[in-house]
Amino acid sequence: MKQKVAVLGPGSWGTALAQVLAENGHEVCIWGNKPEQIDEINTKHTNKHYLPELILPTSIQATTDLATALVDVDAVLFVVPTKAIRSVAQEVAQHLKTKPIIIHASKGLEQGTHKRISEVIAEEIPAEKRQGIVVLSGPSHAEEVAVHDITTITAASENLADAVYVQELFMNDYFRIYTNDDVIGVETGAALKNIIALGAGAIHGLGFGDNAKAAIMTRGLAEISRLGVAMGANPLTFIGLSGVGDLIVTCTSVHSRNWRAGNLLGKGHKLDEVLENMGMIVEGVSTTKAAYELAQQLEVEMPITETIYNVLYNDEDVQQAAKEIMLRDGKTENEFTLDF
């Protein structure tokens, strides 16, 4: 059944998801706050800054007016930076006339509160103005989705029927969705993998080989699982698409902003230079701070996250940081046991 979807955020991922929805026959309106970008989408059907080669379906409309984007919508898809989630959700709540499903595909933790994105949205959009909230996450580069490369991700909601709705909304012959009811696990994996990707990029920038890259990914996954379980997640989620799947794709590809930023840090560039060079939001930088603070609060050991925090915020030398983490006291590998 044809649905009307408002896509909030015309970045690379928002644009790619809008394309999927339009190609599936849905009515799509993209909202953004840059008039020149919105005009480009409407008149040229391109978004050159983010996806230079993509020609968008002509059925996609775009607007800078949020109220217009939200008229008669069946679903609202948030794809804005984590730092903008609360303010955009507040605005959305003012304009909603229908009770749409809320979907978000952003990855991070809110600064200061350390809250997951679905928690922030739930606080700002009252239950009487919406249906459930669904998290869309997994191993997915926008650049590959835009050219129809096969991609599989997860739709997670406490209400599985809402996750199934999103599954049916997006699925086609190149974009497959699996459902999950572990919202905490899916959101935690989505946010924290960006931290580990910064480290993986730094490892590459320092000139280390595959052994080191494998080490940071596997021990990074242990940290993600450790914090996630402390927050109430199912540990099995972290060996799925939104856990190890997203970690692999983010830690091994030049498409990953966080990997590229880490690579520059490993080559000796300062954080300010790196962010200026990137020209796009690098979610892992702010997420590192939030995760470090949350780990302290929950008394969860996260040595890789702590090391990356010190590099980013205490100006610790990357080479020295790599040595220090290797010289920590010995540990056991297995932390969780599963009863079958």
UniProtKB/Swiss-Prot annotation:
Q: Which residues bind sn-glycerol 3-phosphate?
A: 107, 138, 140, 193, 246, 256-258
Residues at the catalytic site:
193 (proton acceptor)
A biological process (GO) of this protein is: glycerol-3-phosphate catabolic process
Name where it's found. Cytoplasm
PROSITE patterns the record matches: NAD_G3PDH
Lineage, top-rank taxon, reads Bacteria
Q: What is its main location?
A: cytoplasm
The alphabetized UniProt keywords are: Cytoplasm, Lipid biosynthesis, Lipid metabolism, NAD, NADP, Nucleotide-binding, Oxidoreductase, Phospholipid biosynthesis, Phospholipid metabolism
Q: Cytoplasm among the record's keywords? A: yes
What pathway annotation does it carry?
Answer: Membrane lipid metabolism; glycerophospholipid metabolism
The function of this protein is: Catalyzes the reduction of the glycolytic intermediate dihydroxyacetone phosphate (DHAP) to sn-glycerol 3-phosphate (G3P), the key precursor for phospholipid synthesis.
Q: Hey, which family's this protein in?
A: Belongs to the NAD-dependent glycerol-3-phosphate dehydrogenase family.
The name of this protein is: Glycerol-3-phosphate dehydrogenase [NAD(P)+]
User: In which organism is this protein found?
Assistant: Enterococcus faecalis (strain ATCC 700802 / V583)
